[in-house]
Amino acid sequence: MAKMESGSGSDTGLIALLIQINKALHRRTSEELLGMRLKQFLLLGYVGDRGAVSQQELETGLVMDANSVVLLLNETEATGWSVRKRDPADRRRHMVELTEAGKLAVARAEKAREGIEDEVMSDLSAEERKTLRKLLKRVLEGLLRVPAESTSQA
């Protein structure tokens, strides 16, 4: 594994560390998720966990804009992993479901993700992993509660 280049040693800010981790993980997962991009994996996993979901629910749940969700759905439909159907209760709305091929692709990618996570987190104990997961969830929840505009008005 490559050594981290942080510039200022232990003074590296949390945001900088999170960005470095994000870039390294994105590169690693993109290479190893069996031909599936990370965003595709997140979308398919979200749908797989919940069953049929609306495009609007995907926007909210994945913290993505409508155009990005549509482009991503176009990709996952083209690969045969998902399908959009009209909602019988509201014909204006589309519901997204996984195909059988999509369910298989998610299962394969999930196994790869577990292996990557075990390798990446190998220096942490089970308790440290649990703590890290809790802390990162709290940070994410806080970010989702605070509108982006309020953070830029300093």
Where are these regions (language model features)?
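Short alpha-helical elements of helix-turn-helix
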Residues: 12-16, 36-45, 67
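N-terminal leader segment of winged-helix/HTH proteins
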Residues: 1-35, 154
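Residues within helix-turn-helix
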Residues: 55-56, 67, 74, 94
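The alpha-helix within a helix-turn-helix
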Residues: 59
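Short capping segments at the starts of secondary-structure elements
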Residues: 50-54
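C-terminal regulatory/oligomerization modules of transcriptional regulators
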Residues: 1-6, 127-154
